[in-house]
C-alpha cells in the first residue's frame, strides 16, 4: 500500500482546479465496496450536487479537507485518511491543517507556500505545515516535498523560531479601550459621540463582541447607506410579501462585500435565509436558473461556505451591530422590528442561534438538515455532552432518517 500523503494547496479554488484536471484513477478503489463511502456519495449527490468536486475527488482516489466543508464531512474524510482499511492514501488540504489537526501522513507535498493567493508563509508556518507528517505514532520521520518556483522563498529552519503574539497587543486600541485608556484615541471618542452612548455602554454592549476597527468601518458605511436601508425596511414593513433580496443587498453594501459576483452572492445569501430550510442542491439549482453563466463549482462552494460559517458567524453578527446602531439613533421601532422579523429571526431559527441543544448538535458536526429529526427522537432535555451521549445511546436504533455524515458523527460520540 502507498504511504499516506498530504497534498497542500493554498485555496479551495486551486484544489478544485487540481481535481478537475487530475486524470489519476486508482483501479483498486471501488466506492461501492465501501458502505460508508457508497452512502456518502449517494447522499452528497442529493444534498449538494452530482458535480461536486468532493465527489469527483473520491472517484479519482483523493480525500479533501478544508475549512469551507461542514465539520461532519471534514471529520469523515479525515477518519477515512487515517484508517488503513479505507485504501485512501492521499488527502488534499488547505491551511486548516495548520490549526492542530493531526493525521497519519508520512509525506506532504507543498504546491505553493501560501495561506491564500497573496499571503506567503513565513518560516514558522512552513515548518508547522511540514510538521503535520510523522504524527499519530505511525512514522518516526515525515517527508516533505516542496514544489518551489524561482519566485517562491527558500526557508531555513533556524528562522522558524517565532514568539507567539496575541492578536491584541499592548499597542492595540482594543486593549486601550478594554482598560479605559481611550482618551488618546479621538476616533473612539468620535464613535461614542455619534452613537450617543457612554464608555460603559460601549464596553458592555460592543467591545466584547467586535474589534473597534470593525465597529468604525460598519458605522461609517451605515451612515453612507442609511437612507437606502431605511427606505428598504419601510417598503418591507408596508409589504410583508415583498422579497427581502434588496434588503440583503443594502446590508451587504454596508458590510463591505466585494463587487465581484455581488448580485450572485447576495442572491445565495437571500436563499439561505428563507423561513424554511433548503438543501444545498436546492439553492444551487435555483441560483443557476437565474445566473446561467455562473461557474457551477463556484456556486456550490459559495453556498457551502455561506451556509457552514459566514451567515452564522459573520453576517448575522454584523447585522446585529447595525441593529444596535439603529437603536442608538432611535430609528422607528417598527423598522427595527422589520429587520428582525424579515431576516434576523430566520437566521436564528435556521442556524439554531437561540436553541442551545440544537446548537450543541451542530457544533459537534451533526449535519444541520438532520438536527430537527434527531431532536424529535431524543428530545432537547440535555445541556452537557454526557447527557447528550446518554440520550443518543438509548435512541440510536431509532435514528434511521438521517444522513451518513450525522450517523458517522454520532457513532463516534457513543462508541
Protein language model regions, located:
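Conserved C-terminal RecA-like helicase domain
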Residues: 2-90, 105, 115-133, 146, ...
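Ser/Thr-glycine-rich phosphate-binding loops at phosphate-binding pockets of nucleotides
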Residues: 91-97
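Short hydrophobic alpha-helical runs that function as membrane-insertion/retention elements
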Residues: 109-110
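Conserved segment of the helicase C-terminal RecA-like domain
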Residues: 114-116, 122-165
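C-terminal or mid-to-C-terminal helical accessory/interaction module adjacent to the motor/catalytic core
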Residues: 164-192
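C-terminal accessory/interaction regions of large nucleic acid-associated machines
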Residues: 183-415
Amino acid at each position: 500500500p502507498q504511504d499516506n500523503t498530504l497534498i497542500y494547496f493554498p485555496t479551495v479554488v486551486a484544489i478544485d482546479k487540481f481535481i478537475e484536471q487530475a486524470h489519476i484513477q486508482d483501479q483498486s478503489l471501488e466506492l461501492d465496496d465501501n458502505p460508508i463511502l457508497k452512502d456518502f456519495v449517494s447522499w452528497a449527490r442529493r444534498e449538494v450536487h452530482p458535480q461536486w468536486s468532493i465527489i469527483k475527488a473520491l472517484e479519482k482516489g483523493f480525500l479533501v479537507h478544508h475549512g469551507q466543508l461542514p465539520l461532519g464531512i471534514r471529520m469523515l474524510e479525515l477518519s477515512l485518511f487515517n484508517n488503513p482499511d479505507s485504501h485512501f492514501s492521499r488527502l488534499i488540504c488547505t491551511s486548516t491543517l495548520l490549526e492542530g489537526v493531526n493525521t497519519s501522513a508520512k509525506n506532504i507535498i507543498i504546491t505553493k507556500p501560501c495561506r491564500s493567493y497573496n499571503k506567503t508563509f513565513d518560516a514558522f508556518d512552513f515548518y508547522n505545515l511540514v510538521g503535520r507528517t510523522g504524527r499519530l505514532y505511525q512514522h518516526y520521520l515525515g517527508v516533505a516535498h516542496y514544489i518551489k518556483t524561482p519566485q517562491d522563498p527558500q526557508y531555513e529552519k533556524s528562522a522558524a523560531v517565532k514568539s507567539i503574539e496575541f492578536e491584541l497587543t499592548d499597542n492595540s486600541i482594543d486593549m486601550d479601550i478594554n482598560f479605559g485608556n481611550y482618551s488618546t484615541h479621538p476616533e473612539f471618542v468620535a464613535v461614542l459621540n455619534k452613537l450617543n452612548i457612554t464608555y460603559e455602554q460601549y464596553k458592555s454592549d460592543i467591545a466584547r463582541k467586535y474589534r473597534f476597527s470593525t465597529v468604525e468601518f460598519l458605522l461609517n458605511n451605515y451612515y453612507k447607506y442609511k437612507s437606502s436601508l431605511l427606505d428598504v425596511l419601510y417598503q418591507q414593513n408596508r409589504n410583508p410579501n415583498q422579497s427581502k433580496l434588496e434588503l440583503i443587498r443594502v446590508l451587504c453594501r454596508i458590510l463591505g462585500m466585494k463587487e465581484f459576483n455581488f448580485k450572485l452572492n447576495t442572491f445565495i445569501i437571500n436563499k439561505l435565509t428563507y423561513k424554511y430550510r433548503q438543501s444545498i442542491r436546492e439553492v444551487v439549482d435555483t441560483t443557476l436558473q437565474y445566473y446561467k453563466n455562473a461557474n457551477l463549482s463556484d456556486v456550490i462552494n459559495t453556498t457551502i461556505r455561506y451556509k457552514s460559517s459566514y451567515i452564522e458567524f459573520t453576517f448575522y453578527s454584523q447585522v446585529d451591530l447595525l441593529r444596535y446602531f439603529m437603536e442608538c439613533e432611535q430609528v422607528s421601532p417598527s423598522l427595527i422590528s422589520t429587520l428582525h422579523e424579515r431576516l434576523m429571526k430566520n437566521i436564528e431559527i435556521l442556524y439554531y442561534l437561540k436553541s442551545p441543544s440544537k446548537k450543541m448538535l451542530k457544533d459537534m458536526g451533526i449535519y444541520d438538515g438532520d438536527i430537527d429529526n434527531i431532536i424529535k427522537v431524543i428530545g432537547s432535555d440535555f445541556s452537557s455532552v454526557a447527557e447528550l451521549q446518554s440520550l443518543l445511546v438509548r435512541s440510536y436504533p431509532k435514528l434511521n432518517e438521517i444522513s451518513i455524515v450525522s450517523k458517522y458523527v454520532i457513532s463516534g460520540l457513543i462508541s
